[in-house]
């Protein structure tokens, strides 16, 4: 950092937290560096979203020559798991763990599933397009492989994001929870912007080998980001206390019925669903 940058940082820090974005979301128990580290799971989600919706959308159609209708179908596959986010969040709320963790096991599984999808994705796409050495491979292998890859990435990112936001609200004080969630989504946007710039730079000029390198690097980055984000975040409760709390919790159907008894629930869900589409 040069001398001018140091002076700018000192001046900005001297203005107080009122001029620092989301500085008021931090508390003595949850300082801003810890919050920013936790938000790295959103960076991994943003990276996956940009890769699926933006980068591969263009690469599959232009460079690999895959029909646009098939590309649209593949990109829509991760949305299949979106309605299950309520169930995923409920299961993490009531998870029985002798280790005393509720959120960590689900985020670990989500990160591993997302990693698996990204790991097989470039090879499946090359077989699907029939380029280079994959020219003689049966197309159905590429179809099944690409569909499985997109489904795995979708399941992983939905699980990671749902449980990660639940963990953030667990750690934050009640009055600062809206600000913490806002910070998480700002980091999601940051991850999307940074990933878009990185993918664009790394894939120019395009080659099949470079596509494999970039997507598998994204798979490794997913594990690293989520590992750093989770490190010593969720406190461990006594196993017996966690089991007792889980045993006394209502079932998902009962919790869903209680939720739907509120006013205009169906209208709100339809609005969110249509807005997402």
Predicted feature locations:
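Membrane-embedded alpha-helical bundles of multi-pass transporters/translocases
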Residues: 2-243, 251-277
């Amino acid at each position: 950092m040069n001398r001018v940058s140091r002076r700018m940082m000192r001046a900005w820090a001297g203005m107080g937290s009122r001029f620092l974005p989301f500085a008021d979301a931090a508390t003595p128990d949850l300082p801003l560096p810890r919050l920013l580290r936790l938000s790295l799971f959103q960076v991994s989600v943003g990276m996956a979203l940009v890769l699926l919706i933006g980068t591969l959308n263009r690469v599959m159609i232009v460079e690999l020559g895959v029909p646009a209708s098939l590309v649209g179908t593949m990109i829509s596959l991760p949305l299949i798991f979106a309605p299950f986010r309520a169930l995923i969040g409920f299961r993490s709320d009531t998870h029985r763990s002798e280790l005393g963790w509720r959120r960590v096991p689900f985020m670990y599984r989500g990160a591993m599933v997302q990693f698996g999808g990204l790991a097989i994705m470039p090879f499946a796409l090359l077989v699907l397009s029939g380029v280079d050495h994959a020219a003689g491979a049966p197309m159905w292998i590429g179809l099944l492989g690409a569909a499985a890859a997109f489904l795995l990435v979708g399941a992983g990112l939905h699980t990671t994001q749902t449980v990660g936001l639940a963990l953030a609200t667990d750690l934050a004080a009640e009055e600062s929870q809206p600000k913490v969630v806002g910070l998480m989504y700002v980091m999601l946007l940051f991850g999307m912007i940074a990933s878009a710039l990185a993918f664009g730079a790394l894939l120019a000029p395009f080659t099949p080998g470079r596509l494999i390198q970039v997507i598998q690097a994204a798979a490794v980055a997913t594990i690293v980001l989520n590992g750093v984000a989770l490190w010593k975040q969720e406190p461990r409760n006594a196993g017996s206390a966690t089991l007792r709390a889980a045993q006394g919790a209502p079932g998902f159907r009962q919790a869903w019925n209680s939720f739907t008894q509120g006013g205009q629930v169906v209208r709100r869900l339809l609005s969110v669903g249509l807005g997402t589409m």
